Curated annotation (Swiss-Prot):
It comes from Methanothermobacter thermautotrophicus (strain Winter) (Methanobacterium thermoautotrophicum). It catalyses: RNA(n) + a ribonucleoside 5'-triphosphate = RNA(n+1) + diphosphate. The keyword Cell inner membrane does not apply. The lineage of its organism: Archaea, Methanobacteriati, Methanobacteriota, Methanomada group, Methanobacteria. Its main location: cytoplasm. The gene is rpo1N. This is DNA-directed RNA polymerase subunit Rpo1N.
Amino acid sequence: MRGILKKISQINFGLMSPEDIRKMSVAQIVTPDTYDEDGYPIENELMDPRLGVIGSSLRCRSCGAKGGECPGHFGSINLARPVIHVGFADTIHKILSSICRKCSRILLTETEIQDYRQRILEAMEREESLTPIIKEIYAEARRDRCPHCEEEQEEIKLDKPVSIVEGDYKLTPSEVRERLERITDNDSLLLGVNPEVARPEWMVLTVLPVPPVTVRPSITLETGERSEDDLTHKLVDILRINQRLKENMEAGAPQLIVEDLWELLQYHVTTYFDNEASGVPPARHRSGRPLKTLAQRLKGKEGRFRSNLSGKRVNFSARTVVSPDPNVSVNEVGVPELIAKEVTVPVYVTEWNIDRMKEHIENGPDVHPGANYVIRPDGRKIRAYNETKDVVLENLKPGYIVERHLKDGDIVLFNRQPSLHRMSMMAHEVRVLPYKTFRLNLCVCPPYNADFDGDEMNMHVFQTEESRAEAKTLMRVQDHILSPRFRDLSSGVYTTISQEHTSSQGKRLFSVRSRPPDPQEGRAPPPDREGREWTVKEIFSMVLPDDLNMVYLAEICRKCDECLEMDWENDAYVVIENGQLITGVIDEKAYGAFAGKILDQIVKEYGSDAAKEFLDSATKLAIAGIMHAGFTTSTNDEEIPEEAKERIEAHLRNAEARVDQLIEAYENGELEPLPGRSLEETLEMKIMQVLGEAKDKSGEIAESYFDMDENHAVIMALTGARGAMLNLTQITACVGQQSVHGGRITRGYDNRTLPHFKKGELGAKSRGFVHSSYKEDSILLEFMGGREGLVDTAIRTAQSGYMQRRLVNALQDLTVDENGRVVDNRGVIIQTRFGEDGVDPAKSDYGKIVDLDKLVQEIRLKSGK
């Protein structure tokens, strides 16, 4: 086949006339058979060799090409009677409702016709949409009497999918076609059918195109039997019924039999085009599986457009499970050697790299870093086997391409599905490692939403210098630390850095830093008076930039009425002066996901590479600190003394008694309804309020008995590393009210939630209040709130996925031009300034152009105030 050499400037959509279908056809298909006894295709049947061939042993009878090279050719079936095309049934119904049943003129006066025709021609000249004008014409052309021949009109209905009913009479496709044939070209244009490319009667089929064999290839099963494609099955049905209809018509069969066969032919043609058309039972395989016909090949997630055109399987990609590795840098990905040897990078041989390329070829495909193929300037591909290696090395010269293995430092694209935002696909540098999983730094998990319970990720290897340059410029991990920022460092950082004691293991801590490796080099702080130790704050200061100045409140801040600043015992007031941590603890607020103050400042003042260095160094320091100081948690962290348990129990009993009082007041008619609420709603709201307060108070009691300095579970909750205080108090004190649809549990068996409660009981326990803690015991009602959460999550995921797809399709053509305007692909201005203020959220201070408070703080710190 020759390629198209001319540039395509536009595409016109139209309908094929019966003559066009016959001209395009290379064979008229008559009988419903496929192969003869020897397994060869028969002429004038569905696998006619003129329609194209599959399998390299046969040649196409139309173009002479072998199987695999022949694109295929259309055939045609002459239908015994016309049938309506199911895709145009709605259009036919609209047209018939707008034209006269006798003369087929449009139901408009001559003046109106001239006026609308002029408007359409002007809109076509300006290349504007005709849809609003056509809609207006259809709305106007609904009249009871024809303005041209004075014929009375009857209401026309569409009985889905293709039956047209006028009054009480069902129109046959032949009658429909006759009416459409009488429409003039001028009227056709007003009805939205351009006579240059289509005629209304072509929507009623008299000739059916038969797709090429290459579109519906038959396969040979293991048993040796041939299995035909679903389209071929459907075409066999159409041919069989068409043949029977023709024979019955020629034999003069009764009208009833002819009409039944005609209906059946219409059914088969309808399901051939769309096997999910409403009002028609789907055509099925012998096994009961619905056939996948033309519309199903194109429609939906598995169809041609979304499955094969928008998204497709590609070469030079790899997929495997991901594992955590804190020794891999934030912007790196650990690639298994097995993958590195299989997925290659094409490198042009030059006089500067020829020796290095020869080394790769020498190693061959089995030794890393080697090469798998060499491509000669004439395009021939040679595998770098041991047998051919010497010849390849001898002939290698500039201009050849060597497909070498992946090696350290190569840039690749890393992706985790579902790809919900731009940080689901980022550029990483390769580090080739042993074993069979991708290795990922834990800092990069939040943007990918990855965890290590079996998640798999995809890697794509760039094949051109342009794509590599683009990825390095736009997609590096460190360039996406902001908007949204990520990173949720382990709570061990808090423990190490908040401890006021000094570390006699200072050198051991420093040795894990990427630079400098020894505390005596670079910015090592001076040792204390005895010359042996450093404070942990001094150690942490080593990973901060020299002139960093900032003040903020840490995650553990209690939000006191009057800020105690540096005097607060829990060290929640963070002050950094000229790169030295003076006071404060380092927790999630320092470099957590969406909240990292220090990380945020470093990115904005020193750039993304400095932020990457800080993340790497802080991670290594944290891990070394945890290894040195130890950090673990167990159920003992959720233990409280008996005294606390008694206080909690008394408080909960008191709350349940108050609930009983409310119920008694309701039953005695003493309860006053709240404004705008019924008595029942008032009772439920007051009960929920009492039980909510009881749960909160029991949590506060439990919290007051926790050791804030030594209890590791509490440290994790306070620093934002994992969980919240609510989780701890539910484990320790009281789970609380289980909520379903925003209220207490009401549904159950015969006017009660569980069989062991009294009928109609309204008490706290019988409606889902869990008195005990997770640690003590549980009741059956506990699962109901959790179950609602799971169902909600599943439904929300589907809804948000569909919503995002619609938004992406609607907004994908919008861009911000060089003037800061939002424009679509036609140049139409959507916004004169992006976001109305022209601020890039990624470079703003949480949406603001400038943070004045931060600037004032910096000036004060730099001036020593």
